[in-house]
Regions:
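Non-catalytic cap/lid and distal C-terminal segments of serine-dependent acyl enzymes
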Residues: 1-240
Length: 240
C-alpha cells in the first residue's frame, strides 16, 4: 500500500556504474511520484545499456517482460500501456529511449535525461580509451551497434505507426554537458534526426546544466508533466 491511488507506473533507469537506489537517495522522486499517483520501479541493470548483452544478462527482457510480470502478480500494478512510462539518466537515458521505442506497445512515454543517445558516436573509435571495456560485453568484440539497438532505426519505425500508438519522447540535456561524454553533441545530433520525423509527441528541453543530479531531478519533474499533461512543472517552479 503506497498510501495513495495509483494512476500509473514510472520505471526509472540508472546510469553507468550506478544503481536504481540512486534515484531515491539523490532526487525527490518519491515525492514527485506521490504528488502524481505514480508507482516507481527502479531496477538494477549493471552496465548493460539495457540490452540483452552479448556477454552478460538479458536486461531488455528483464525490464520489459520479466519484471512487469513479477510486479504485476505481486502488487497488481497497472499494466495498460497508457499508464506506463519509462525514463532514465545518462546510460539510462539511452536505455529509456531504446526500450520505449523498441516496445511502443508497453509505454506511453519515454524520456532521456542527459542521455548517451548516439552510441554510434561513442563507438566510432574502437581504440579510444574505455570503448572496448564498456561496450565489448554489451555488443561483442566487433563493437558493432545492431540496428535493433540504434535509436535512429527504432524512431523511424515508431514514426510509421499511427499517432495513437506512438509513445511520447522527451530529451533533456544541459548546455554545459560536453566532456568527457559529449552529451550535448550526442543530443544535438539525435535532435537533428528526430525533429523532421514527425513523431506524434516529441519534445526537447535544454537549459544551463552539467552531468549531475540537480539537472536530473528537474528533468524528472518535466518528464512527469509531459507524460501526464497535468501542469506539474509549473506547480513546482516556486520550489526551484
Amino acid at each position: 500500500d503506497v498510501g495513495y491511488t495509483v494512476k500509473g507506473v514510472l520505471t526509472l533507469l540508472h546510469g553507468y556504474t550506478n544503481s536504481g537506489d540512486d534515484w531515491m537517495q539523490m532526487t525527490a522522486a518519491p515525492r514527485y511520484a506521490a504528488d502524481n499517483g505514480l508507482v516507481l520501479v527502479m531496477p538494477d541493470c549493471g552496465n548493460s545499456f539495457y540490452q540483452n548483452m552479448m556477454h552478460g544478462g538479458a536486461y531488455k527482457t528483464f525490464v520489459t517482460e520479466e519484471l512487469p510480470m513479477l510486479l504485476g502478480r505481486m502488487f497488481k500494478l497497472p499494466a495498460r500501456r497508457e499508464q506506463n512510462f519509462i525514463a532514465g539518466l545518462s546510460m539510462g537515458g539511452y536505455g529509456a529511449l531504446f526500450l520505449g521505442l523498441s516496445r511502443p506497445d508497453l509505454y506511453a512515454g519515454c524520456a532521456s535525461f542527459s542521455g548517451a543517445v548516439d552510441l554510434s558516436m561513442m563507438l566510432a573509435d574502437p581504440a579510444a580509451p574505455g570503448v572496448r571495456e564498456v561496450f565489448g560485453p554489451v555488443f561483442g568484440d566487433g563493437l558493432l551497434l545492431p540496428k535493433s539497438s540504434d535509436l535512429r532505426v527504432l524512431a523511424q519505425r515508431v514514426a510509421a505507426l499511427p499517432a495513437a500508438q506512438q509513445p511520447k519522447v522527451l530529451l533533456t540535456n544541459g548546455l554545459q554537458d560536453v566532456e568527457p561524454y559529449f552529451i550535448l553533441q550526442q543530443n544535438d545530433a539525435m535532435h537533428k534526426f528526430l525533429k523532421p520525423l514527425g513523431l506524434a509527441g516529441y519534445r526537447r528541453l535544454q537549459w544551463n546544466g552539467v552531468h549531475e543530479w540537480n539537472f536530473w531531478d528537474r528533468s524528472l519533474v518535466y518528464a512527469i508533466d509531459y507524460f501526464l499533461n497535468n501542469g506539474y512543472a509549473a506547480k513546482k517552479l516556486n520550489d526551484w
